[in-house]
């Protein structure tokens, strides 16, 4: 982690859930983060909980508004896309490509149109980063099946919506540790299920 931080300029936090935001991490590595003048990018929120915590550690924080573009240099920029009260995605533009990271967001059609309007240069290819399985509680087996199917179909939907040149599925290797929760894993999508679905739908992808 220290080696990574010594070669890091920015840290993006999508939202405050513990699989995306670690209080322990920032407390433990705050001195290294400050020494390297790492800028933390986060969304403006009404409760300001994350904002106030990071400021209490005297870290360099840049708050972004919904659809606000933050430019790193002439060829690289990031645009934050809020969803609901807590979550966010981002659109990262480079010289040749757009990188759309959906994170944990579930955008409705109107929101997808709004994101699409942010893509100004139609000559650039778009790479999509997206979940491929559910990662939260579902009360019935039937609901688990539907949640798993929804995640796969959503990949196809977003790929078609944005005419993606490449899909990078990620962020779905969850594990419920308590014995009472073992059935929740029964219908989760694994890499083999995902690979078969993407190939059957002629979607170009990269599994890391």
PLM regions and their residue ranges:
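Active-site environment of divalent metal-dependent phosphoester hydrolases
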Residues: 16-21, 47-50, 68-71, 86-87, ...
């Amino acid at each position: 982690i220290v080696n990574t931080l010594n070669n890091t300029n920015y840290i993006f936090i999508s939202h405050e859930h513990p699989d995306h935001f670690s209080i322990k991490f920032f407390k433990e590595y705050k001195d290294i983060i400050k020494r390297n003048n790492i800028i933390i990018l986060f969304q403006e929120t009404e409760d300001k909980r994350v904002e106030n915590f990071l400021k209490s550690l005297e870290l360099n924080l840049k708050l972004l508004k919904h659809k606000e573009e933050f430019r790193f240099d002439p060829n690289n920029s990031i645009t934050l896309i809020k969803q609901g009260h807590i979550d966010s995605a981002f659109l990262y533009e480079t010289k040749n490509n757009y990188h759309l990271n959906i994170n944990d967001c579930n955008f409705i059609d109107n929101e997808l149109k709004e994101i699409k309007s942010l893509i100004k240069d139609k000559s650039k290819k778009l790479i999509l980063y997206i979940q491929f399985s559910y990662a939260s509680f579902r009360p019935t087996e039937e609901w688990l099946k539907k949640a798993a199917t929804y995640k796969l179909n959503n990949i196809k939907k977003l790929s078609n919506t944005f005419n993606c040149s490449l899909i990078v599925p990620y962020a779905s290797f969850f594990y419920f540790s308590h014995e009472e929760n073992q059935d929740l894993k029964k219908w989760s999508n694994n890499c083999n299920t995902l690979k078969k679905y993407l190939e059957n739908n002629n979607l170009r992808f990269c599994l890391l």
